[in-house]
Amino acid sequence: MIRAGVVLFGADGIAVIERIRDGLTYYVLPGGQVDPGETLAEAARRETYEELGLHVRIHGAVAVVNFRETTQHYFLAEAIGGEFGTGAGPEMDSPVDSERGSYRALWLPPHRYGELKPKPIGATLAAVPDPEAVVTGWLAAPLGFDEV
């Protein structure tokens, strides 16, 4: 499966989806499956609107993460419209006790970047003084990670 998502910084941190499933709470970058006929960037824009309620400009690829049978492509994005937290994709109405668990858009503050999944991206951003500058640097040479 191929997925596309975004790294989106704001005044309060990085945009994430808080997932609560099977009693666990975790934070993932916005994104989802690439639909037939979509480019990776188109899928990243669509998923960002569905999950966050924001229209974004894609600045370029910053990371590719291989996880199990999935390749996840992440793009640096900039919000250009919409209202954060108004995403209306089908998953956004999923209750905590459902098989899929719940989804909620929020800004993860910098001191919590280490909790972010994919873990290689979260760990890298947590370890540097200027995460946004580091991610911008990845535009020149997107990182590749295998997450276990």
Region spans (language model):
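Short, well-ordered beta-strand micro-motif
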Residues: 8, 76-78, 106-109
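Active-site segment of metal-dependent pyrophosphate-handling enzymes
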Residues: 53-93
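Hydrophobic pocket-lining residues within nucleotide cofactor-binding pockets
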Residues: 34, 79, 110-113
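The catalytic Nudix box helix
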Residues: 29-61
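Short strand-connecting beta-turns/loops that link adjacent beta-strands
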Residues: 11-13, 21-23, 67-69
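Nudix hydrolase/Nudix homology domain
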Residues: 24-27, 85-148
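Conserved N-terminal beta-strand and adjoining loop/helix that marks the start
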Residues: 1-15, 33-36
